[in-house]
Amino acid sequence: MRVLAAMSGGVDSSVAAARMVDAGHEVVGVHLALSSTPRSHREGARGCCSLEDARDARRAADVLGIPFYVWDVAERFRQDVIEDFLAEYAQGRTPNPCLRCNERIKFAAVLDRALALGFDAVCTGHYARIQRGPQGLELHRAADSAKDQSYVLGVLSQPQLEHALFPLGDSLKTEVRAEAAARGLAVADKPDSHDICFIPDGDTADFLRSHLGAAPGDIVDSSGRRLGSHDGAYQFTVGQRRGLRLGTPAPDGRPRYVLEVSPVTRTVVVGTADELSVTGLTGVRPIWCGPPPDAPLECTVQYRAHGAAAPAVVELRGDEVDVEFRAPVRGVAPGQAAVFYADTRVLGSATIARTRRAAVGS
């Protein structure tokens, strides 16, 4: 089988490519250039996709003895990921750019190009598992629950899964690092990237401010009482507690959280933890890993990248998905993905459009 190994320059993608070589496949390494002005880690950047990352990927390919190329996808990435990121924040939503990159870049633009060039599959270093079930391929959580990335892969459809390979799905991260060291890969001890790759300093608010400009407005409580001001509602996300800079302290002394962001009125609504609870949500643009459900579905729903999944009933209603949680949950932000699970299996996903807030005291 001809396999295109997407190599970021990190330990995970390097070991994933190595395992494909060991399996006897014809492997070609490709590093994705996501920016027209590649940066250096020496500039203080902590994310991925720097010049050093490209060099690390090439060195790993050399150790493995496989051909290596750099593919320029910067313009597509700018349009489909960065511009989408900015547009979502401008509308008061909180997007997940890693999920969008998987959906529109790695398993769309890159996969399409790979298939056109005669490759059979794209291999990545994601921690997730693909298994064949009675109705086709199934996407499952990884064996390493701390590293599981099935949430950001929940946008993949059955045709995309047919051409995806995740060799690390059954491994622990500690095992992957040990294997990299044993193979003589220089990236064995390279730190993981935790930042949004196009915001390497981690300052999302500054990035948004520099691209969207100042848009001052009020911070109010759920009754409409003014508590403070801001210079851009897009800097806030539902569930946020830090950095609110309230000019008027809450009369009860309890912490305040962001409940709602309204870019049209430039208003940020804050409230107590109890007011943050929601009983359900409406999702749009559903994507199913298999056949869509024809009846209400009992499952668990993960509604943010690093959160637990909550029991819920999911019902497909035309082009939307209705989710009713079995118990109120907190921190559900429009723009994020709701990913539906049956135990470890990913059933599908949808983008959170609206939430239903619980009555205080419920």
Curated annotation (Swiss-Prot):
Gene3D superfamilies: Adenine nucleotide alpha hydrolases-like domains (2.30.30.280), HUPs (3.40.50.620), Translation factors (2.40.30.10). Keywords: ATP-binding, Cytoplasm, Disulfide bond, Nucleotide-binding, RNA-binding, Transferase, tRNA processing, tRNA-binding. The active site is at 101 (nucleophile), 197 (cysteine persulfide intermediate). ATP binds at residues 6-13, 32, 125. It is found in: Cytoplasm. Disulfide bonds join 101-197. The record marks 126, 336 as: Interaction with tRNA. GO terms for cellular component: cytoplasm. Its EC number is 2.8.1.13. GO terms for biological process: tRNA wobble position uridine thiolation. GO terms for molecular function: ATP binding; tRNA binding; tRNA-uridine 2-sulfurtransferase activity. It is an enzyme of class 2 (transferase). Residues 147-149 are annotated as: Interaction with tRNA. Coiled coil: none annotated. It catalyses: S-sulfanyl-L-cysteinyl-[protein] + uridine(34) in tRNA + AH2 + ATP = 2-thiouridine(34) in tRNA + L-cysteinyl-[protein] + A + AMP + diphosphate + H(+). PANTHER family: MITOCHONDRIAL TRNA-SPECIFIC 2-THIOURIDYLASE 1, TRNA 5-METHYLAMINOMETHYL-2-THIOURIDYLATE -METHYLTRANSFERASE. Belongs to the MnmA/TRMU family. Catalyzes the 2-thiolation of uridine at the wobble position (U34) of tRNA, leading to the formation of s(2)U34. This is tRNA-specific 2-thiouridylase MnmA. The gene is mnmA.
